[in-house]
Amino acid sequence: MGLKAWNGVVLAAVASIWLASGTQREKPILSEQQSLRVRALETQVAENPSDPNAVKNLAQAYLDARVPGLALNVVESAPASVRREPIIDHLYARALLDQGRAVDALAAEQRVLDACEPGMDGTSRCDTWLLASATRRADILRQLVELGVEDANAHPEMSAVAYHNATREARLAVR
């Protein structure tokens, strides 16, 4: 095969690679319906970044859309007063867990539990749902960390063991 033939083969290969790479479009992160909802929530956060409810709704929308990295960014870029809210820390812990950072998620969930402890008057600043959810997730995260699992998604069988260990019931037989 002559030099011209080899040049033709190489040029044809390069052209086919170029055509194949140029025809695929990037997939959107959010669906059309989710993007409309998220756009409205992003506008609310941009207008009032110190509103914990707006930050919570936006971070939750990102978690629902399975983009925990964006949820982390929303929480980490929020003012410190917002980040200290227990519900925001609870969402932050979930985003950290979804990102494969179990140790950091456990620390965030422990901050939620510390913030939800009853004060001297016996009242808590957290509702019962948040307290129950944070307690359950902290138990599961503690088991994950004890088993040495940093990324629960990468080790589903160990995650199942941790979940089972954290949620099993203890029965007491009284005779």
Regions found by a protein language model. Name each.
Residues 121-175:
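Terminal, low-structured helical/coil segments at or just beyond the last alpha-helical repeat
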Residues 1-40, 174:
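Long, contiguous interaction/recruitment modules in multidomain scaffold/adaptor proteins
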Residues 31-34, 68, 102:
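TPR-repeat structural position
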Residues 53-57, 86-91, 107, 121-131:
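Alpha-solenoid helical repeat scaffolds
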